């Protein structure tokens, strides 16, 4: 439902937050849009929080994010793999408690198509600021409706799928859902690790035309952990851009694109 962001984060979602902050700030008070949550971004967050009578801790959490996106017409879509009994009522419940309505996926064959169809049904054109996948993972692999099993056919994302034209073409149907400064995140364990993880995020960035981020280490769920990454991450950008270059390219579009 929201990304948990604080000083030190370097993410496409920070870029989105900076754009939204600039929309709310007075002329002359705007901050650089670079994806780097540094001192000036924290100061801008505190200023925004004080102006909106929020807890001025300099952290973007549930309430601050809700205030930033109010009236913007933007969507955060979460999809959660609950194929394991232990996963039910965990991250999916965290998202509900934060006011979200996650797409919940139980163990099934062919889950990949089912999940993507649900995203297409829920997403609105040009309005998704964050698409986030929760579940089990491994380097270059993200479970969608598999739990920890590896023998459920077509129920996961894997780097090898980008060799298949049919998969790329089907996945590309999601691209029009994203707003100009949208992104996709994979919160499975070590999905971004190694060469397989590099191929994985690069494949998504190329096909979806938005940044793709995955954790390189073990990821946790529960409470705030459901809404943030643990440890090192890997992000790929469309056209091979850097975070700074991609962020700069979105700054002007972000000022112009207000969704009602």
Regions found by a protein language model. Give the residues of each.
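Acidic, Ser/Thr/Pro/Gly-enriched interdomain connector segments
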Residues: 1-35
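Intrinsically disordered, low-complexity Ser/Thr-rich linker and spacer segments
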Residues: 2, 67-77
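Structural recognition of the beta-strand scaffold that forms the well-ordered cores
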Residues: 20, 59, 75-84, 129-134, ...
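Extended, structured, electrostatic nucleic-acid-contact surfaces
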Residues: 21-32, 43-56
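A domain-level signal for caspase-like cysteine endopeptidase catalytic cores
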Residues: 73-123
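Catalytic cores of nucleophile-dependent amide-cleaving enzymes
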Residues: 133-134, 139-223
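Caspase-like cysteine protease fold
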Residues: 214-260
């Amino acid at each position: 439902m929201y990304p948990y962001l604080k000083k030190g984060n370097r993410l496409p979602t920070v870029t989105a937050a900076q754009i939204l902050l600039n929309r709310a700030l007075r002329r002359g008070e705007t901050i650089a849009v670079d994806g780097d949550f540094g001192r000036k971004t924290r100061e801008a967050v505190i200023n925004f929080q004080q102006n909106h009578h929020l807890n001025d801790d300099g952290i973007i959490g549930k309430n601050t994010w809700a205030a930033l996106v109010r009236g913007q017409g933007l969507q955060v879509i979460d999809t959660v793999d609950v194929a394991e009994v232990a996963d039910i009522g965990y991250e999916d419940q965290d998202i509900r408690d934060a006011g979200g309505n996650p797409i919940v996926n139980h163990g099934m064959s062919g889950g990949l198509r089912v999940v993507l169809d649900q995203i297409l049904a829920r997403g609105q054109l040009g309005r998704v600021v964050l698409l986030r996948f929760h579940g089990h993972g491994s380097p270059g692999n993200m479970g969608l409706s598999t739990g920890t099993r590896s023998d459920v056919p077509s129920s996961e994302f894997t780097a090898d799928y980008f060799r298949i034209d049919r998969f790329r073409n089907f996945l590309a149907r999601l691209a029009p859902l994203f707003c100009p400064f949208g992104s996709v995140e994979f919160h499975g364990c070590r999905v971004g690790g190694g060469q397989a993880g590099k191929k994985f995020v690069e494949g998504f960035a190329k096909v979806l035309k938005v940044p793709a981020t995955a954790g390189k280490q073990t990821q946790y769920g529960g409470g705030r952990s459901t809404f943030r990454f643990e440890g090192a991450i890997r992000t790929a950008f469309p056209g091979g851009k850097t975070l700074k270059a991609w962020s700069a390219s979105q700054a002007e579009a972000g000022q112009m694109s207000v969704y009602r």
